[in-house]
Amino acid sequence: MSSNKINKKSIARIAAIQAIYQHMLRNNDNIDDIIENVLSFYRNDTSMTDSPIKISLTISHFKMLVKLVFENIDKIDEIISNHLVNDKNQNHIPILLQALLRSGICELLFFPDIPTKVIINEYTDIANDMLNDHEIGFVNSILDKIAHENKRFYDK
């Protein structure tokens, strides 16, 4: 019997999106409490006993990603706002899409050791599982533009 596994960093990214989303819904709950809440889900093996897929995450990547998002939230949100068209503001973007973009942009800006193409592909794949087709294209487009603007696209 073979064991299916999902990449631990991929799960860390999904968990980060969950934490960011939770923070946005709860109107600024303590980040450390939210991190622990999300981690408790992944530590609780009984919640996934029927799953044929082994799910675990890179805790250090998850924690660093969430903390960096909130330490740099103004910069990240400004970048998102600068990429909106037709006079839309960030309040018109669904919360889940905002959470995903915040996490992806944070990785592009503050995780230079991770290849840009990996970041863009990972967040596009995650978007594919969570968002509609228009939003998936939006995620891919924004992350690609930000990577080019920050001269990260051809780095690795």
From Swiss-Prot:
GO terms for biological process: DNA-templated transcription termination; transcription antitermination. InterPro entries: NusB-like_sf, NusB_fam, NusB_RsmB_TIM44. Keywords: RNA-binding, Transcription, Transcription antitermination, Transcription regulation. GO terms for molecular function: RNA binding. It holds the Pfam family NusB. Belongs to the NusB family. PANTHER family: ANTITERMINATION NUSB DOMAIN-CONTAINING PROTEIN, N UTILIZATION SUBSTANCE PROTEIN B-RELATED. This is Transcription antitermination protein NusB. It comes from Rickettsia bellii (strain OSU 85-389). The lineage of its organism: Bacteria, Pseudomonadati, Pseudomonadota, Alphaproteobacteria, Rickettsiales.
